[in-house]
Amino acid sequence: MQINFKFFFLFISLSIIWFSCSKEKDTEITVTEKNLKEDTIVSIVEIESFAQSIYIDLLGRKATRVEIDAIFNELKPTNASRESRYTIIKDIIGTNEYYDKLYLYNIAEYLNGADENTVYDQRLQLVYIKQLGEQDNNQVLIEFAQNGINRLDSVIVIPERLKQKVFSEDEMQKRLANNAIYDDINMGVPNFTFSIFESFLFRAPTNQEWQNAQNICNTIGGVLFGINGQTKPDFLDIIFSSDHYFEGKVINAYLRFVERRPNSLEQYQGTVDLIDSKDFQSLYLTILSSDEYFKR
């Protein structure tokens, strides 16, 4: 039988083309499935990293497996949308554990690494000094010690007052700057006033501001930010109610959570919102729910 070689070669060529296309299709499917699988793995890693970051930053501890799974189950259906992240963070901010950590973070930050035991130890020392004053009928010593005790007591009650929403972070930080521990760290009026500007306003005072601040604390009297003051409590009231303080809080929040200073728009908007609402948690929610924080 005679073979039609022309037809035979055509058949072979078509078979090769069909086989090649089939292989390419198989390969394409495999690659696509592989990419989807890799994307899913990355998504899981990102969500777990986000969960751990939130718990460490807000509660000072790592999230448990149960907590991570709960966050994953809430974020996965929305592809970790900003709205779903916002909801998760809002559920954490405002809990009792959050306020306890907020207090401990601040006393460590502003009282040179102090903890609750440091505060109670300092109070015991003042109680002992008061007892010595009472034994010697030394009224000056008694009043000095009692004043110190009262100021530390105002620090000790901070966590409960925050939970009860009696006051917010501005009052907490004012109390942390007005006690024997802070005084010992920043001894003398020049050091004390300068440290207040650096620690809470995130800038150094101008020479005029520094001099006026010292005059107020030394009861000479002066004007700071357009407000008259005569005493150290007056100075602290002026600082912690000023627009400059809220500017500093915005700077502090960005440095703490995304390790940079806010840009001009972020600084302006954050400060205006804080001055208007005194809602520090809203500022934190804005930063913590951002894509920048999620992807850092």
Where are these regions (language model features)?
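Bacterial Sec-dependent N-terminal signal peptides
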Residues: M1-E33
